[in-house]
Amino acid sequence: MTSTATFREDFHSLRAGGLNWDSLPLRLFGKGNAKFWDPADIDFTRDAEDWQGLTEEERRSVAMLCSQFIAGEEAVTQDLQPFMAAMAAEGRFGDEMYLTQFCFEEAKHTQVFRLWMDAVGLTGDLHSHVAENPGYRAIFYEELPRSLNALHDDPSPANQVRASVTYNHVVEGTLALTGYFAWQKICRSRGILPGMQEVVRRIGDDERRHMAWGTFTCRRHVAADESNWDVVQEQMQHLLPLAVTQIQWRPEDAPEETPFRLDIDELAAYASDRAGRRLGAISAARGVPVEQIDVDASPEQLEDQFGVEDAAALEKA
């Protein structure tokens, strides 16, 4: 087998005009740098005390929720790397810069959940909380790695759209951000777990930047070729039933009344509203000049608006 070495021809940072700091990926990169936070700075002492005050069923519910969160963060940390290679193949160095930060933040989210779990004593094997959930298995064990790893062999626009819909719009937008919002609302309404409240607030802020990049990437490809809008819709239609299965699944021995009295209908409405508005932003890119998409701040502004709306809702919790 003969291997052909690939040599570097030039440097993006040395080209005339330098880097385009007005492009959305580099704006997100700058915003992420300005909002840096360290998981080790968060105090979980009160959380460990509050944990002891939860009922056995409440602790099991929290353990399941956190297991799904941390395993998801670990999975996306591992699976994101093919997208970086796809951006390199396109010559999009600004996207590469942002995705390095993106991946670092996912690893940091894994760290902070593990620190919290260690602090409250969740140190046993927790695989049953994810492995027995058929929706979770389908998305995180199969669909996520499949869609991202497809970029290794074929980083085509259609495959990038499928990967972004899977990663950004289903895993992050439909599952993670909805779950984080619900969990923070529960903690605030009961006045418990202040460390976890800070964790979720900071992670949510990071994830909204990730979502902005995912929406931007889909918009870029839809603007270049309207047939990619069909790819967006097909992938969403394929994955959403799996997401619903994950959310609705409960262990066979779970009590009839959901711990914390979580309103599933309210969560479904929240997720549907956010997904619909993000998909609307992608659809709106049809017919827009591609060069205009690169500096269009609308995906970033949409996520900022979601942050404002979440903060207002949590104030009422």
From Swiss-Prot:
Positions with a binding annotation for Mn(2+): E73, E106, H109
CDD domains assigned to the protein according to its UniProt record, in alphabetical order: RNRR2_Rv0233_like (cd07911)
Cofactor: Fe cation; Mn(2+)
Cofactor comment: Binds 1 Fe cation per subunit.
Function statement: Probable oxidase.
Binding partners and assembly: Homodimer.
Protein name, UniProt field: R2-like ligand binding oxidase
Organism: Saccharopolyspora erythraea (strain ATCC 11635 / DSM 40517 / JCM 4748 / NBRC 13426 / NCIMB 8594 / NRRL 2338)
Taxonomic classification: Bacteria, Bacillati, Actinomycetota, Actinomycetes, Pseudonocardiales
